[in-house]
Amino acid sequence: MILSLLQEIDEICRRNKIEYYLSPRLTLCAVEGHPFPQNPMFGVVLMKTADMERFRLAVDEDPREKRALESMKSHKWFSGFYLRYTNTDTLCLNLDNTRDYAFPGIGVSIFPLRTPAASVKAERRLSRDENAWTELCHINHAERNFRSRVNRTIMRLQCMITGRQGQAAHLYDRLVRFCQQPGANKYILKRRKQTTVFPAEIFAESKRVTLEGAELQVPAKTAEYLTISYGKNYKDAKEPRYVTSIALVVSARVSYTQFWKESGNFEKYCKERMKNARKLARSRRHKDYFNECWDYVEFCGERMNLSVSYEKQKDYIKNLYKNEDYMTLERVFRPYFKMMQKSLQKNELFAEDEEIFDIYVDVLEKTGKTVQRSKIGTLI
């Protein structure tokens, strides 16, 4: 199914003289003769930003039966700056993110090869707005820090003013306009969890390769393309074993409309599932916070026990220090050194006894352990 969609994309691109490239994973399969990936989400091609917009317009002008092209221009819950070319007579639905696509069928994602924006300021503003939009679409997985909350609030206000669909389309147009600067020396592939930077020369030319009997297009400099994506040993890269997610429903025989009908009140089901997913995400955050607190309690207990141990050795340590036996003191302070390292990672000092602490700091200087000594100096 994905292969047939790739062939259709190839046909549309050749007819309209649009350049495209198979994703690094599919290119590796074609070049090294690996089997086609089983994961239905691995159908990916890349296009330069301007070419991606031309492709969108070409499909809109000549739509095909049982096919849909989705983007932020057409769907107010579309979560990112890319396109998705879908077979609407199939089913590929993530039950935890039911709003992602208006047509949740098996499809091919078309990701843009972006150029950096004309200025650093514009780049930061675009990145801020794009991240805020993505987090609004997947609120259960959003960052919880102050800056992210502020950015999401601003995006919500903009959605209230222009409407959610209007804001999505406006953001898409901005990204298209600013991410296709002429004369750029690099292209950026931005995915949800990974960003890859390619030299522009890699995409200067293309060539045809065979993938599962179908002729498709990849960058002419295939070796460089795959080396950046997988490293020098890309030929040894293995396809990860695919295990279907519990939340993913996939079928090439049943359409998403049939699935919705058989599910009864699907809208109600989606709302309940999203509500439960929100509760689960909240409980996970509480659990993480509890685990963090418990780890800190254990750390404090460990530190207290060690301080009691050194309190018992205090006279012995003072005698060694008086006799300037720094070799023995270094050995005695090894557990103290490790505990100090852990404390410094938390921006704290292990200084339960000031007298022992002063001796320890002097021993650090005498034994040449200047790195930890300088870190302690910044906190004193």
Q: Residue ranges of each PLM-predicted region?
A:
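Alpha-helical repeat scaffolds
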Residues: 293-297, 328-339, 369-380
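Alpha-helical junction/boundary sensor with strong preference for TPR arrays
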Residues: 300, 340-344
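Active-site nucleotide-donor binding segment shared across nucleotidyl transfer reactions
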Residues: 10-43, 47-53, 201
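Residue-level signature for tetratricopeptide repeat
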Residues: 319-322, 363
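Conserved catalytic core of two-metal-ion nucleotidyltransferases
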Residues: 1-14, 56-128, 132-229, 236-276, ...
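Generic helix N-cap/helix-start motif at coil->alpha-helix transitions
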Residues: 307-313, 352-355
